[in-house]
Amino acid sequence: MSDTQHQVNVRVDTRYLPEQSAPEQNRFAFAYTVTIENRGEVSAQLLSRHWIITDGDGRTQEVRGAGVVGEQPLIAPGAQHTYTSGTVLATRVGSMRGSYQMLGSDGVAFDAAIPVFRLAVPGALH
């Protein structure tokens, strides 16, 4: 059975930040811009986030917290919310994935999956 009430799509674009990186110190900074689109039939508020960040050596870090960049946006049906944040890795490549914990205006809590996306210094991958 498909839940048409609660459908949230997440897209992510990334970029390497050379001006904030120090490769000689194994510090590689990345920005990511997330677009959260509410394709459901009810408004949905983003309450919290859960990230799983993995570097190129397989080291994993989990991050949990309220909202995103200090906000807990309420996203109407058909609307979207976009924000930019960042992370620092100790390797030239890595990945992130996770989920947002959402609350529909109908009182139903649900998770919106954040598909895995790659972080990579340009030219690091063939």
From Swiss-Prot:
**UniProt-listed InterPro entries:** ApaG_domain (IPR007474), ApaG_sf (IPR036767), Uncharacterised_ApaG (IPR023065)
Superkingdom classification of source: Bacteria
Cite the Pfam families for this sequence.
DUF525
**Cysteine disulfide links:** none
Q: Which PROSITE patterns match?
A: APAG
What is the protein name given in its UniProt record? Protein ApaG
What are the ApaG domain coordinates in residue numbering?
A: 2-126
| Species annotation | Pseudomonas paraeruginosa (strain DSM 24068 / PA7)
**In the UniProt record, what gene is named as encoding this protein?**
apaG
HAMAP family with a match to the protein in the record: ApaG
**BP terms from Gene Ontology:** error-free translesion synthesis
